[in-house]
From Swiss-Prot:
This is Large-conductance mechanosensitive channel. Homopentamer. Channel that opens in response to stretch forces in the membrane lipid bilayer. May participate in the regulation of osmotic pressure changes within the cell. It holds the Pfam family MscL. It is a multi-pass membrane protein. It comes from Bacteroides thetaiotaomicron (strain ATCC 29148 / DSM 2079 / JCM 5827 / CCUG 10774 / NCTC 10582 / VPI-5482 / E50). It is found in: Cell inner membrane. GO terms for biological process: monoatomic ion transport. The chain crosses the membrane at residues 12-32, 85-105. Its main location: membrane.
């Protein structure tokens, strides 16, 4: 066998089924993340914000130092703030994505287990009990062995 080149090694690695499956999973996961982020930001959080007094969670922040504004109204120095609302939003996104992935994996596991149980070979049937004739013949054989 000759030496394999770097490109041949990379091609062999990249064409493995697991790597391709993982790449597809990453792409689908990225798209799924965007869908869930939109669901959280546009569907789930507005009613929750309404219930707690019309709060938009992404706007929640703690201003540690106010912005400095000049006499002409232009901002001289930006405000220093801790934007914890965006953190809350990202946390809700994560929890919902994690829960959705958990449900998906649980479904796949159940289907795989069910399919494996259906495909599992049945235990071989127990051999039938010997008939009366077979028992009698066995006893005769044993008696003949004893006489020898």
């Amino acid at each position: 066998m000759g030496k394999s080149t770097f490109l041949q090694d990379f091609k062999a690695f990249a064409m493995k089924g697991n790597v391709i499956d993982m790449a597809v999973g990453v792409v689908i996961g990225g798209a799924f993340g965007k869908i869930v982020s939109s669901l959280v930001a546009n569907v789930i959080m507005p009613p929750i914000g309404l219930l707690v007094g019309g709060v938009n969670f992404t706007d929640l922040k703690w201003v540690m130092k106010a912005a400095e504004v000049g006499a002409d109204g232009k901002e001289i120095a930006p405000a220093v703030s801790l934007d914890y609302g965006q953190f809350l939003q990202a946390t809700f996104d994560f929890l919902i994505i994690a829960f959705a992935i958990f449900l998906f994996i649980r479904l796949i596991t159940k289907l795989t287990t069910k399919k494996a149980a259906e495909e599992a070979p049945a235990a071989p049937p127990a051999p039938p009990a010997p008939t009366k004739e077979e028992v009698l013949l066995t006893e005769i054989r044993d008696l003949l062995k004893e006489k020898k």
